[in-house]
Structures are given as structure tokens and as C-alpha cells.
Amino acid sequence: MKYLNDNIRTLEELKKAYHRLCLKLHPDVGGSDEEMKILNAEYETLFERVKNIHANTDGETYERETTETPEAFQWLIAELLKLDGIEIEIIGCFVWITGDTKPHKERSKALGFRWHSKKCCWYKSPDG
């Protein structure tokens, strides 16, 4: 593998690594289409291997079936990278967006994000 490490053990690790690499390789942030094609192919391969393997807060792994597809997460990250002034953070199975999110309120809702009033940021849980 050129970009992703074969030692990735869980879906959460894979998503974090993919997001980190998208911030470098996506064409909207200075990367190239060819680099993203390679990264996406690697993501899809590893996704099939770890899609049902998750980690709890103690770092112990467990299995739980998912209906998520690799394309859905790739599409979500690509859409978020188009929004100016936001920070994307992946914590466990959740995707959080912070920063200047107010101009992107309707788009965030359309992408399936919910507003967390106590943390004052948007989040998307694995089940929608």
C-alpha cells in the first residue's frame, strides 16, 4: 500500500488515517486526482477487511456489523472538504465539525449532521 498502513486494525483507525491523508491529497487542498484515486482504492480494500471491527474506549476491539459502504464515507469527507472555515475531527465512529459552521448550517443538515447544543458543534453518528 502506498498511503494507508496494512497494520490498521479497526474501522475507526482507517477513517482517521483516510481523513488525515485527504487533507494532503485531495485536489481541493492541493493534491491530485491520481493520488486520490490510489488512496480511495486502498481505502476500499482495507474497508472490506475492517468494516465490522471497532474499538471501545479502552482500546479493546469488538465486532459489530455495519451497513456503511466505503463510498459513503469517502463522499462525506469530500463534501466536507468543500466547506471553508471548518475543522473535521473523527472520534471513534463519530464525525465532528467545528469552526465557522454557521454559513454551512443547511449543508451540514443535508449531510446528516446534527447540532450538539452543549458542545456547540455539528456531529454525525454512525447510524445517521
Predicted segments, located by residue:
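Post-J-domain flank of DnaJ/Hsp40 co-chaperones
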Residues: 1-5, 45, 49-90
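Short amphipathic alpha-helical segments with coiled-coil-like heptad repeat character
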Residues: 26-28, 51-52, 122-124, 128
